[in-house]
């Protein structure tokens, strides 16, 4: 049983028991952590405001025999501008949901925290958040080993989609905006990504 400090990002939370929250964190030192924040639902809780989804935080975790507890937490960055814009909020929460789905407890993915922060910043500034989210999702799927080699795969998919998927897999997320796709093509890419997510 021990306490450890780390930096991380809140991927989500849900209410449990009468006054507690179950918190999903991705941490720099320990990867994905699922922890209990005791009393977090109380109005007077010290956790109030710090457990919001996509808050970047410093956190003290207590690793017990059965449960991990959030002992202390401090918000370092909260992207307040997102919460004042419903469209940006919707898109960033989607990114948090994807990240939470694709990471497993105690699993570490290299540079995920930085990738997630870059994605949020791009969503705040781009006119095409959809392609940023596509690029981010493909990059995580690639990190966890779900993505095939698009240059060598034998498939019935049109080559233009394979080329696009390989581009957003290998290039910086901001470069995804440079590729022009029709609305129909973007929807087709979404369908492909959804199929890939089923294998994750």
Located regions from the model:
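Non-catalytic alpha-helical scaffolds and adjoining flexible linkers that form interface surfaces
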Residues: 1-21, 26-200
């Amino acid at each position: 049983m021990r306490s450890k400090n780390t930096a991380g990002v809140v991927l989500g939370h849900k209410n449990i028991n009468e006054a507690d929250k179950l918190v999903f964190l991705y941490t720099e030192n320990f990867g994905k952590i699922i922890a209990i924040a005791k009393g977090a639902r109380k109005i007077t809780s010290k956790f109030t405001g710090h457990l919001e989804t996509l808050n970047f935080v410093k956190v003290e975790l207590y690793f017990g025999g059965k449960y991990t507890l959030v002992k202390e937490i401090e918000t370092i960055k909260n992207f307040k501008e997102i919460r004042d814009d419903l469209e940006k909020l919707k898109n960033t929460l989607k990114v948090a949901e994807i990240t939470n789905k694709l990471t497993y407890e105690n699993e570490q993915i290299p540079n995920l925290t930085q990738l997630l922060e870059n994605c949020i910043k791009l969503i705040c500034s781009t006119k095409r958040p959809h392609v940023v989210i596509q690029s981010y999702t493909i990059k995580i799927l690639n990190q966890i080993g779900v993505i095939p080699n698009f240059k060598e795969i034998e498939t019935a998919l049109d080559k233009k989609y394979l080329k696009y998927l390989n581009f957003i897999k290998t290039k910086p997320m901001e470069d995804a905006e440079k590729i022009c796709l029709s609305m129909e093509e973007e929807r087709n890419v979404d369908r492909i990504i959804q199929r890939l997510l089923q294998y994750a």
